[in-house]
């Protein structure tokens, strides 16, 4: 799955302006590009025989996404401690959409994520225009 994560991180936003494009595009890109891999991974890692491998994999995910948040902190002006859980929400929404194509779940998660990011940008990056997502 590291190829999947590498592909995802290559599309990462370069700055706040790019953030909104990224959030709108990445769920559909993820489903199209990696949906089959996610479905296979979930079939394997939820099987009792392989559950311990899934737990180990996701422990690594926690570390990798925290590092990813640290790399975004200077670009977005938001502390990585705030970005890390938002990344988890985005990834969960993307994976759920890739697995089930549940548009309602995706849109509700994305809207809350965007609103939270707007508030964080205003709080931690006040030099940025408060009308960021017009």
Name each model-derived stretch.
Residues 1-8, 30, 65, 91-98, ...:
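Hydrophobic recognition helices of helix-based DNA-binding modules
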Residues 2, 20-24, 59-62, 66, ...:
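Generic alpha-helical structural signal
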Residues 3-33, 87, 110:
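Hydrophobic alpha-helical connector segments
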Residues 8-11, 38-48, 98-102:
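Secondary-structure edge/capping motif, primarily at the C-terminal ends of alpha-helices
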Residues 24-32, 39-49, 120:
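Helix-loop "lid/cap" segments that line or gate small-molecule binding pockets
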Residues 29, 33-36, 49-77, 81-85, ...:
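Amphipathic alpha-helical packing segments from all-alpha helical-bundle domains
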Residues 38-41, 53-54, 107, 130:
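Short, hydrophobic secondary-structure boundary micro-motifs
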Residues 59, 72-120, 124-134:
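Hydrophobic/aromatic-rich alpha-helical bundle segments in the mid-to-C-terminal region
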